[in-house]
Swiss-Prot record:
<keyword id="KW-0732">Signal</keyword>
<dbReference type="GO" id="GO:0001708">
    <property type="term" value="P:cell fate specification"/>
</dbReference>
<dbReference type="GO" id="GO:0040025">
    <property type="term" value="P:vulval development"/>
</dbReference>
<keyword id="KW-1003">Cell membrane</keyword>
<dbReference type="GO" id="GO:0005615">
    <property type="term" value="C:extracellular space"/>
</dbReference>
<comment type="function">
    <text>Probable secreted lin-12/Notch ligand or co-ligand involved in the mediation of Notch signaling. Involved in the lin-12/Notch pathway signaling of cell fate in vulval precursor cells (VPCs), acting redundantly with dsl-1 and lag-2. Required for normal octanol avoidance response, acting via both lin-12/Notch and glp-1/Notch signaling pathways in neurons, in concert with lag-2. Involved in regulation of sleep-like quiescence during the larval to adult transition, acting via Notch receptor activation and in parallel with EGF signaling.</text>
</comment>
<dbReference type="GO" id="GO:0045747">
    <property type="term" value="P:positive regulation of Notch signaling pathway"/>
</dbReference>
<dbReference type="GO" id="GO:0016324">
    <property type="term" value="C:apical plasma membrane"/>
</dbReference>
<feature type="signal peptide">
    <location>
        <begin position="1"/>
        <end position="18"/>
    </location>
</feature>
<dbReference type="InterPro" id="IPR053124">
    <property type="entry name" value="Notch_signaling_modulators"/>
</dbReference>
<keyword id="KW-0472">Membrane</keyword>
<dbReference type="GO" id="GO:0007219">
    <property type="term" value="P:Notch signaling pathway"/>
</dbReference>
<keyword id="KW-0914">Notch signaling pathway</keyword>
<dbReference type="GO" id="GO:0006970">
    <property type="term" value="P:response to osmotic stress"/>
</dbReference>
<keyword id="KW-0217">Developmental protein</keyword>
<dbReference type="GO" id="GO:0005112">
    <property type="term" value="F:Notch binding"/>
</dbReference>
<dbReference type="GO" id="GO:0045177">
    <property type="term" value="C:apical part of cell"/>
</dbReference>
Length: 189
């Protein structure tokens, strides 16, 4: 063996030994990230996630899947995803301070007559998280991509374009969307 071969082998051995430390450091950083943001995940993505402000919706839609990927949520049993069998979808909260915030709220079950609900036949209601709603594109064919989920996904854009509609053709399109997505009501002008 000549000097160059010995030097090359020494460099390879040093690099091979340095790599596990880097992996350990990344795992430690990942663990710290998971611990640090667990409360945020439970607040915005977990079973008890409340309504999400529209300003945060985009960030939450990216955060929830990233946290689940890096922190092995569901596999390790940290947080179980909600039951997707229920058709009820809670859309994002409208911006506060808006004069029209209460005019485009989803129709709630409380508005239905009391005799329709019975304790024996009432379906179990579950909210879809922002991360799940973000995946419900119009082309989605997954089991959780119900019409209600797709409506909740497209509602912010529809609300922006339809209030007020820019033309008669757009008004007709908006009317068709609101008739399909009955959980939302259009702003009345």
């Amino acid at each position: 063996m000549n000097f160059i071969t010995v030097a090359a082998l020494a460099i390879v051995m040093v690099l091979a030994q340095a790599n596990p430390a880097r992996v350990r450091r990344n795992e430690e950083m990942s663990e710290r990230y998971c611990i640090k943001h667990l409360d945020h995940y439970n607040k915005y993505c977990g079973d008890n996630a409340g309504p999400i402000d529209r300003a945060l919706f985009g960030k939450v839609a990216k955060f929830c899947p990233a946290y689940e990927k890096h922190c092995a949520v569901g596999k390790a049993g940290l947080v179980e995803l909600p039951d997707l069998g229920s058709p009820l979808v809670m859309p994002p909260v409208l911006p506060r301070g808006s004069d029209f915030a209460s005019l485009d709220l989803p129709i709630a079950d409380e508005r239905k007559p009391a005799h329709i609900h019975s304790s024996r036949t009432a379906p179990q209601t579950t909210r879809l998280t922002a991360a799940i709603v973000a995946t419900c594109t119009p082309e989605c064919t997954a089991a959780h991509c119900t019409d209600e989920c797709k409506c909740a996904h497209t509602h912010p854009k529809v609300h922006q374009m339809c209030n007020p509609p820019s033309s008669a053709a757009m008004a007709e399109t908006c009317q068709r969307w609101y008739s399909k997505c009955t959980m939302f009501t259009p702003v009345q002008y």
